[in-house]
Amino acid sequence: MAARQIWARTGAALCRQPSAAPPPAPLWVRAGFRQQLSLTLCPANEGNCGGSAPSTPGRPERAARPSVSEELTAAERQIAELHAAACAAGQLNYVDPATGYVVLTQIAHLQRGECCGSACRHCPYGQVNVKDPSKKKQFNSYFYV
C-alpha cells in the first residue's frame, strides 16, 4: 500500500508537464560575460602588461586593440570570427577549418578554472602551466599562434 502511494506521488511529480516559461539565461549572458571575452590577456607575472589600468573594472578598453583586418591574415581572421561566433552562442568548442581539429573556446577554458598546460589557442591564463618553452605560442592580440 505504501509503495503505491510513493509511486503515485513520484510519478505525478516526474510526469508533470513542463512549464511554459523559458529557462533562465546562462550566467555568462546575464553577467555580461560576453563583453569580457574581448580582453587582451597577458601572463599573470606581467601584471597589467605595462599599460594603465582600465578605467572601469571588468571592462576592456576599446582602443587597446586594432581592428581585425589590420593585423591578421585571412586564415587568422577566420579563426577569430569562428571563435567569436562560438563564444557568442555559448559553445565550448568549434572546428578549425584548416585542420578539422576541435578547438576549445575561451568559455571552456574559463570553466576549467586554470591553465591545463597544453598550449591551447584561446588560453585566457597566458599559458602559464606550459612546461616546454618551445611549445609556448605568441599571442596575436586575439589568440595564440
Curated annotation (Swiss-Prot):
Tissue expression summary: Expressed in retina and retinoblastoma.
Superkingdom of origin organism: Eukaryota
GO terms under cellular component: mitochondrion
InterPro entries the UniProt entry points to: DUF5522
Phosphoserine modified-residue sites: 67
UniProt keyword list: Phosphoprotein
Name of the protein in question: Uncharacterized protein C1orf53
Gene field: C1orf53
